Every structure is written in structure tokens, then in C-alpha cells.
Design a protein with these regions (language model features):
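Extended alpha-helical assembly domains of large eukaryotic scaffold proteins
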Residues: 1-288
């Protein structure tokens, strides 16, 4: 249509001048695009503007340094890029809500129009996420993954096929969604081994679980350590030797895991036997 052609033309012209587009103007344009249901325009323009605003990748270097807290030009550039990414995330969130509304409207109805609206909403959302995840901007991917986790969309996160996801799950986070560092990192590693399982890399899953079981930073209960080790054993036994993982390496690793699991289980039995004795000693003192 004429409107679609005009929107595409405006997008092309704005992307070409993205370096000259201040944040406030970008926000205004994206708001207009959203009103016109031009999600592709919001995503394309906001991501282009974020990269154009920081051609030297100052924000990327700032993130690599762990986002130092002191006020600096680098922090300002980083925060500006985050504000631009937020326009994309707001659009994705609106499409999620639109699909939820359309899907809920299907309950108890066979109305053809309602089914068409739901199908259209699903397609618009799917296309938007596909476009966003095609970005080669690592900072945006970190924002997207963190946002998905904050909204409890772990299943959706693990379904993504991007070259940045594994690195994010095994990396050092700076955006913690209000959680403690140890709690957030443990959550990432839990998702990492699940990602490996989804991809059929059982050896990597077993290694991640083994690292979780032996990580002092997480202050695991013995029962949690046993659970991680049991999962590691199960994954190790699912590994098929290959050019990347030799049979001897798999056998040695699985044996070590079995031994660690057995030791942990013995510790649990001993603790279980000692607890009634502690209670008994306490009762005897009370009687005395």
C-alpha cells in the first residue's frame, strides 16, 4: 500500500542519517512507527541508531571492563545505547501482550476473525523477534537476554539460535535484575547446561553440572550438590565418543563423576544418621 511504501521510504532515509538522530528524536519516530504498527521500522532504526551513535564501540569497551561505576563519557555512551535498545524491547513486549490478548480471545469461540487476528499477531511477533535476533550487536543481545530472563521467559531464551547466547550464559553478568551476583550467575549456569542438552552436547552439559556441583560461590546444600552430580552422571553416560570427545576422556570423566556422587551420597547418609543423635543428646540434657 501507499502507507507501507511511505514507511519503508522514511525508514531507509532515517537509517542513512542515523548518526545525526538524537535519542529524543529517535524516541518520537519510534513512537509514531508503533502507532502505525510498523514494528520492523522500530527495530531496524533503533538498532541502527545505537550502532551509529557509538561508531568507536566505546560502550562495548566499557562493558568489557565490567561497567565501572564512576561517572565517565564511556558510561554516558553505554547508557545511551541501552536507552535505544529499550525501544526495541518495548516493541517486543507490546507484541507479546498483543498476542496474549488475541490468544485469550480464542477461548470458547470459533469466530474466524478472532483466529485470523491471533494468527496475524503470532506472525508479527515471530517476525519481530527474528529480525531482532539477527542483529550482530553483542550489547543488544545481552540486553535482550537479560530482559527475557526478567520476564520469566527462560523457555523462549533457550529456543534462540544466536552466536551470542552461550557466551552470555557462561559469562560474567553486570545486569542482575535485582538479584545477588551468586544467585544470578547460578541461574545462568543452570540455563547453560539445559542449553547444551537441547543442542545435544551432553559432554558440555555434564561439565557444566560438575562445575556447578563443586562451585564454592553458590553455597550449595548437600542435596543440591547430589542433584547436580546425578544429572552430570546421566549426561556423561549419554555422550557418544566423537572426534571432539574421545572415548577414554568420556570414561574417565564419567568415573570421576560416579565417585564424587558416591562420596556425596555417603556424606548425606552420615548426616542423616547424626541428626537423630543430636536430637537425642538435646533431649537427655533437657531431662537432666
Amino acid at each position: 500500500t501507499r502507507i507501507d511504501d511511505d514507511l519503508q521510504t522514511s525508514l531507509r532515509l532515517l537509517v542513512a542519517r542515523a548518526t545525526q538522530l538524537p535519542l529524543e528524536k529517535l524516541q518520537q519516530v519510534c513512537a509514531t512507527y508503533r502507532e502505525l504498527h510498523f514494528s520492523r521500522g522500530v527495530i531496524t532504526l533503533a538498532l541502527a541508531a545505537a550502532r551509529a551513535s557509538d561508531a568507536a564501540d566505546i560502550a562495548l569497551a566499557f562493558r568489557a571492563d565490567g561497567c565501572p561505576e564512576e561517572v565517565s563519557h564511556s558510561r554516558t555512551v553505554y547508557q545511551q545505547r541501552r536507552a535505544m535498545y529499550a525501544l526495541v524491547l518495548d516493541t517486543l513486549g507490546a507484541l507479546d501482550a498483543q498476542l496474549d490478548t488475541a490468544s485469550n480471545a480464542l477461548v470458547g469461540t470459533k469466530d474466524a476473525a478472532a483466529h485470523t487476528r491471533a494468527a496475524d499477531a503470532e506472525k508479527e511477533r515471530r517476525d519481530a523477534y527474528a529480525l531482532a535476533t539477527q542483529s550482530d550487536d553483542p550489547l543488544f543481545h545481552e540486553e535482550l537476554y537479560t530482559w527475557l530472563l526478567a520476564h520469566g521467559r527462560t523457555g523462549q531464551l533457550l529456543e534462540l539460535h544466536t552466536p551470542f547466547l552461550e557466551e552470555f550464559l557462561q559469562g560474567v553478568p553486570v545486569l542482575l535484575n535485582g538479584e545477588s551476583y551468586a544467585t544470578y550467575v547460578r541461574g545462568l549456569r543452570d540455563l547453560l547446561w539445559q542449553l547444551h542438552v537441547r543442542r545435544g552436547d551432553f559432554f558440555a552439559a555434564a561439565q557444566t553440572l560438575d562445575e556447578l556441583a563443586h562451585a564454592d560461590a553458590f553455597a550449595l546444600k548437600l542435596s543440591e550438590r547430589i542433584e547436580y552430580l546425578a544429572l552430570a552422571v546421566g549426561n556423561a553416560k549419554s555422550v557418544r565418543p566423537s572426534a571432539q570427545v574421545h572415548a577414554q576422556e568420556v570414561i574417565g570423566f564419567a568415573t570421576q563423576l560416579d565417585e564424587d556422587l558416591e562420596v556425596a551420597q555417603v556424606q548425606a547418609k552420615i548426616l542423616g544418621a547424626l541428626q537423630p543423635l543430636d536430637t537425642l543428646d538435646w533431649d537427655e540434657e533437657e531431662k537432666a
